[in-house]
Amino acid sequence: MRRSMASNGHILTASSVVGASSAFQNPCLAKVEVQPNLPQRTVLGVIGDNEQRRRSVSRGGVPAKSLPGIENVLAFPGKILSANPAPVAPKPSFTVYVDEPTETYSVEIDCPSLGDEDSNIVKQNIHLLLDISEASPMVVDTSPQTSPEDDSVTDPDAVAVSEYIHEIHQYLREAELKHRPKAYYMRKQPDITSAMRTILVDWLVEVGEEYKLHTETLYLAMNYLDRFLSCMSVLRGKLQLVGTAAILLASKYEEIYPPDVDEFVYITDDTYSKKQLLRMEHVLLKVLAFDLTVPTVNQFLLQYLQRHAVSVKMEHLAMYMAELTLLEVEPFLKYVPSLTAAAAYCLANYALNKVFWPDTLEAFTGYALSDIAPCLSDLHQFCLGAPYQAQQAIREKYKTTKYMQVSLLEMPSILPLN
């Protein structure tokens, strides 16, 4: 089923995955044009209150858009915005460079001769063609991998570098404090809500499953998104554009074979042009100051699971619980990733083994159970309500046999933390 979003946060469904229109623009279910000869894709409508524009879904040619790309992204003012802010003309806090024609530069490089007879320096003029156009800034090699993807043949010690595990953990603990989004940034957003962000995360999970992206890619994308929204005000009509640019950037960082830019344009039902997406990627990088290497909940959880070996089922259950924390800004953004990962480990361990936090991990992390208890309680309550959430992409993901159907396990109703 194709899923679309309305401005009130409800999920709208249609009969096809392809051609989802901008349901955020209209609370009613938007019309869908189906391209019968194309493979099915997961698409998401755009968040917005304005009248949605009629658009063609034809892949043959996308009509040019007149939107500048970032006109709905504003810098936060110095004070908290009121509930009904007065209309203010958008003022971008940075300069977006307009695409220029291809230019040719001549660079002189001094190359010494390799022969003994000719010791003179040879000057070569190398012409570099710098294509400053709308084309993708990178070329993706889509050839299949030659080696089979078998995690069982990977030596964990070779990957984790066990000799330096304490130094690595200490470095990640220090780095997580430097790249944290603001815990309550959503309260300062004038036009978007936590419910809209939740719907966006749900869609990004489906995108990750559609293109078989790594779990770490999703966590990185959410870090980029939350850090961007912590200091920039975004109108609902551009929220999906920022989210798409975030997962595009995370894919380039994490994946060996990331999807092409055109694929990300396609999954938005061509709501945004390729030029808009690349410009938003540029804006995202400037706001993040190119700080893309950040610790995530996933990284800490993998450390814990490797440090204190558990069953495969518990690994999947802990990963499921940790991924659920991506759905909500409050209360989980107020906890550092290492603490959230510890809470996911404790809850999964108690659900299956009736124990919380092993002594080995307490010594390794310095976290006592009393330190983890507040985050653990919040995560427990959220997991109890997960089956009744409108957004079910994460639960559906972990319902599969690949993850041993851990999302179907019944959570304990009470945790003996006192």
Swiss-Prot record:
One Pfam family in the UniProt entry: Cyclin_N2
Protein family membership: Belongs to the cyclin family. Cyclin AB subfamily.
Assembly, per entry: Interacts with the CDK1 and the CDK2 protein kinases to form a serine/threonine kinase holoenzyme complex. The cyclin subunit imparts substrate specificity to the complex.
GO MF terms held by the record: cyclin-dependent protein serine/threonine kinase regulator activity
Originating organism: Xenopus laevis (African clawed frog)
PROSITE patterns: CYCLINS
Subcellular localization(s) per the UniProt record: Nucleus
Gene3D superfamilies the UniProt entry points to: Cyclin-like
Keyword Ribonucleoprotein assigned: no
Main location: nucleus
KW Cell membrane (keyword) present: no
Alphabetic keyword roster: Cell cycle, Cell division, Cyclin, Mitosis, Nucleus
Protein name: Cyclin-A1
Lineage start: Eukaryota, Metazoa, Chordata, Craniata, Vertebrata
Biological-process GO terms, alphabetical: cell division; G1/S transition of mitotic cell cycle
The gene coding this protein: ccna1
Free-text function comment from the UniProt entry: May be involved in the control of the cell cycle at the G1/S (start) and G2/M (mitosis) transitions.
GO cellular component, one term: cytoplasm
SUPFAM superfamilies in the cross-refs: Cyclin-like
